[in-house]
Swiss-Prot record:
Protein name: Asparagine--tRNA ligase
PANTHER family: ASPARAGINE--TRNA LIGASE, MITOCHONDRIAL-RELATED (PTHR22594:SF34), ASPARTYL/LYSYL-TRNA SYNTHETASE (PTHR22594)
Gene: asnS
Entry EC number(s): 6.1.1.22
GO biological process, alphabetically ordered: asparaginyl-tRNA aminoacylation
Lineage of the organism: Bacteria, Pseudomonadati, Spirochaetota, Spirochaetia, Leptospirales
Amino acid sequence: MSETPIVSNHDLGKYVDQKVVIQGWVHGIRGSNARQFLSLRNSGKILQVLAEKEILGEEVFQTVKHLRQETSVTVIGNLVKNEKSPIGFELVMESIQIVGESENYPITPKEHGIDFLISQRHLWLRSSKQLAILRVRDSLSFAIRKYFHERDFLLIDTPILTGSVGESAGTLFSTEYFDLGNAYLAQTGQLYLETAIFAHNKVFCYGPTFRAEKSKTRRHLTEFWMVEAEVAFATHAENLKLQEDFVKTVIKETVQNSFQDLKVLERDPAPLLAYLEKDFPVIDYTKALEILQSKGEDIVWGDDINSEREQLLTVEFGGPVFIQKYPREAKAFYMKVNPEDPRTVLNADLIAPDGVGEIIGGSEREENYENIVQRLKEEKLPVESYDWYLDLRKYGSVPHSGFGLGSERLIAWICGLAHVRECIPFPRMMERLYP
């Protein structure tokens, strides 16, 4: 006689009207003195388990009745269809074994403050909404990789520890690196990613990046995940087309694969998908200033377009908008100077609506050796630290372009969340390094 199969909530359909073993955690319990309904979490889904005193006997039934939230258990019973249960099945319990007790679980069904929940992040991840966000994140990660692999991009794993500054020296995390001086946590994989376009034309990387920005806004983390792409021979205009297609494709695929999770989050994806049905407008930084000034904003050429002003522009255009050709002094050394207006560079930021803000930054890269050395000097960066990067401009240099997208902001937009701290399993912020 075969053993009773151990099954997960993921594939219950194969075992209807059979005796099965389910292992999981008590998500909740309710009932009467004759029967109890146990919500059992397994593989991220909730299975309803019916425990009847008449079947189990008084002693086992009382054990079930007094189970506490997050107790881990092994349950044996008969699996039946039940359209009224959360996932269409119900387990009629025959026996139960307690695997691990759970005493005084701190996150109860009552309301808790966000600071408390973040401090209990290692436990909060078990909640239905947080699990839904994790699944959306997983779906987005899959969609990103699928997009690039289907278009012949090669994944390049870029280093986390680096001796070169990728963005701003003022936002670096540094550490001593043996006898070689300081090493830095990577702000971007871009410089290393550029090396690989000479081998494979189209490449991307996807991993954690770090910014020591003293910012406490709802859009900033000190550690976040960024996907970056580089394409040999690509112009600024071609780069914009790639970015728009990339964003639209991965959002649509993620939403399609996350319908139930978005339902848990009470996120109606229809308004989000509607944004994707039209072309994203592209406006120059100078034009953006003119629009803002017409709305009474006190802003002059060279000023930063802050998050509030970004949102004014998304309202003006009714959705996402590219702002291109920013002042060169405000942007990184590797961005190509705009030949039509040397005050600016050939870059663009994609600004998302609904308070999300910038989700992509991209540019055409400077391919000329002398020009990029000059830009390094302007930024007061040590040229010798970039010898390896400058070699790329000596041996078969070509025009090329690329971009970077912060996945947490995109997740926040897809899920309709106000703060990026819930979009990564363990958020790192100015005031948060635990757990």
